[in-house]
């Protein structure tokens, strides 16, 4: 095998990339915009949780939340999940078919705190609860216990509002 043989596929790939560079750039920009929306939504919910935590501490002299962790799925993880579920790879599919691109894990001091916090979030006018899975009341067969809320929150950008 010569250096030329190794470079041939690379040159072919470069030609393909050059031919479709504008389209690729548009998709990259759209993906970054979508991830920015998820990051912004996480900031909105994180702020709500911090406010509730501080308010609870002020009025009850204890913390109901011991930890808040946030995460955004990586592009590779998003792609793998779309492929695994046989979902078309598109921005629209990410937005409409995946409900775990962004996530917040909240660790509470007591189980009652979880339900109190969930109720406080449900009562906020700008939060739309999409679904709830209560694995505390109904643990999984393997013993997993948790409370999952999937929600939509509005995020206000320079030119538009997004959920």
Q: Where are these predicted regions, by residue range?
A:
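Short cationic amphipathic helices and targeting signals
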Residues: 102-108
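Solvent-exposed, flexible loop/coil residues
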Residues: 82, 105, 139-140
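Short flexible coil/turn linkers enriched for glycine and charged/polar residues
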Residues: 98-100, 143
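A broad, low-specificity signal marking well-ordered, structured residues that form hydrophobic/aromatic
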Residues: 49, 104, 147
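Long beta-strand-rich cores associated with HINT superfamily self-processing modules
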Residues: 110-163
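Charge-rich, low-complexity segments
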Residues: 1-97
């Amino acid at each position: 095998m010569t250096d030329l043989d190794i470079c041939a596929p690379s040159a072919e790939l470069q030609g393909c990339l050059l031919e479709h560079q504008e389209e690729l750039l548009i998709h990259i920009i759209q993906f970054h915009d979508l991830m920015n929306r998820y990051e912004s939504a996480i900031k909105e919910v994180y702020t709500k949780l911090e406010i509730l935590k501080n308010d609870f501490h002020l009025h009850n002299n204890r913390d109901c939340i011991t930890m808040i962790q946030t995460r955004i799925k990586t592009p590779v993880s998003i792609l793998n999940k779309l492929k695994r579920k046989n979902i078309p790879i598109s921005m629209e599919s990410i937005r409409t078919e995946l409900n775990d691109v962004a996530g917040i894990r909240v660790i509470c001091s007591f189980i009652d705190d979880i339900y109190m916090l969930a109720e406080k979030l449900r009562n906020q006018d700008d939060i739309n609860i999409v679904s709830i899975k209560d694995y505390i009341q109904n643990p999984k067969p393997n013993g997993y216990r948790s409370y999952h809320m999937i929600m939509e929150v509005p995020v206000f950008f320079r030119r538009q509002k997004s959920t």
